[in-house]
Structures are given as structure tokens and as C-alpha cells.
């Protein structure tokens, strides 16, 4: 129960509904609420867009586009991702388009009036895990985050896979790809010891790496 969580204690009593998304971002204020021809949705992303300037220039080349959210003088990459999604006729086609044109990594979480849509980046550099308990589903970058809340591992998205979560369960909207380039630093540096990625526990992997390093020194 960190100071970050307690900041929202008073707000929780005012919330209604049965779904929500959130993000702790080092760079961009998010989630963002977007109203477009695709309807209203909230969006949160995690990753690095290497060709952001190119995509911004291409988006500005058409009429009716503007970016409002700025972070340190730069375009908010979550807003850029939303702009890419809005260039197609449906949320799913828009997500697939964003996955296709983004150079780098971008995992996407959308909240619509009736569902949560999760999309792992096309090469699976970052994990997306779904937990489940008797009350519903949750989705997270780290499995330990929902373990502490009483959820059990339910599903792990593959590269580029898109799923929809509702009160009725989990539905696959786009099948996973075959190419996987998951970030190795998840096990060696970034990951929480209790977390599992692609079925491999972070703490177990670190002990194994230590054994290999020690063996090579003998």
C-alpha cells in the first residue's frame, strides 16, 4: 500500500462501473480519454516508438489532426498511438495498423464502454498477462501485481495478439504472430522476482544465470 495508491482512496468511493485501466508512466501522462469517429475510449500504452517523429509528420500531413498532450516538449506517444488507431475504420483494424507502422515496441490497452481491449506489441518485446478470480478478469505487465490481489494466472498474450475482456470472459480478436523478440532484460534487470514471463520465473532465471557465471569462473 504505497503513497501512490493511497492518493486515490477518496476517489474510489466516487467511481462507478465494472471496468477501468491505469498506468504509471515514466514519460507520458496517461491514460488518455479519446473521442473520435470510432467512439469514446480511454487508452494507455507502454513501450518505445523509435519512428515517432516520422509518424507525427505523416499524421499532420492530412487535414484535421492536432496533438494536445505534450511531455517535456515532445508529443505524447500514447496520443500518437490513438491518432494512428483513429486512421482506420474500427478499433481492431486501427490497433493492427498501429502495430504495423510503429518501429519499436507498443503494447496497447483500451477501455471502451463495454470492454477492455489488450494488444501486445507485434514482436512480443513486453509481456501482457491476464489474471482471473471469481469476480472477473484483470490484465497487467507483471503477474505479481494481480497475484497480490487474489487473481490467478489465466492467459498470456502472444506477439501481436489482441483480446477483449468483458463480464462474459476473454475473447481473441487477433491471433498471435510467430516471431517473438521478448526483452531479455525482463529476467536480468527489470522484472520483479515473483513474476513469470513466457512460463519462466524471474527469480529462477536469475539463480540459473548465477550458476552459469559461477561455473564459467571455476
Predicted regions and their residues:
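Conserved short alpha-helical segments that host acidic/polar catalytic motifs at enzyme active sites
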Residues: 1-159, 164-218
Amino acid at each position: 500500500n504505497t503513497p501512490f495508491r493511497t492518493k486515490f482512496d477518496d476517489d474510489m468511493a466516487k467511481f462507478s462501473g465494472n471496468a477501468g485501466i491505469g498506468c504509471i508512466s515514466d514519460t507520458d501522462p496517461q491514460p488518455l480519454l479519446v473521442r473520435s469517429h470510432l467512439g469514446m475510449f480511454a487508452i494507455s500504452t507502454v513501450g518505445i516508438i523509435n519512428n515517432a517523429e516520422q509518424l507525427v509528420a505523416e499524421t499532420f500531413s492530412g487535414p484535421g489532426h492536432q496533438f494536445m498532450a505534450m511531455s517535456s516538449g515532445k508529443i505524447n506517444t500514447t496520443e500518437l498511438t490513438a491518432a494512428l488507431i483513429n486512421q482506420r475504420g474500427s478499433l481492431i483494424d486501427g490497433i493492427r495498423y498501429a502495430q504495423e507502422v510503429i518501429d519499436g515496441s507498443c503494447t496497447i490497452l483500451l477501455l471502451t464502454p463495454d470492454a477492455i481491449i489488450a494488444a501486445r506489441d507485434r514482436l512480443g518485446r513486453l509481456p501482457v498477462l491476464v489474471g482471473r478470480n471469481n469476480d472477473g478478469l484483470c490484465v497487467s505487465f507483471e503477474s505479481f501485481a494481480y497475484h497480490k490481489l487474489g487473481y490467478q494466472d489465466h492467459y498470456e498474450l502472444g506477439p501481436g495478439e489482441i483480446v477483449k475482456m468483458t463480464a462474459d470472459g476473454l475473447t481473441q480478436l487477433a491471433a498471435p504472430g510467430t516471431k517473438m523478440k521478448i526483452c531479455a532484460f525482463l529476467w536480468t534487470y527489470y522484472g520483479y522476482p515473483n513474476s513469470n514471463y513466457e512460463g519462466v520465473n524471474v527469480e529462477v532465471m536469475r539463480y540459473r544465470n548465477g550458476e552459469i557465471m559461477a561455473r564459467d569462473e571455476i
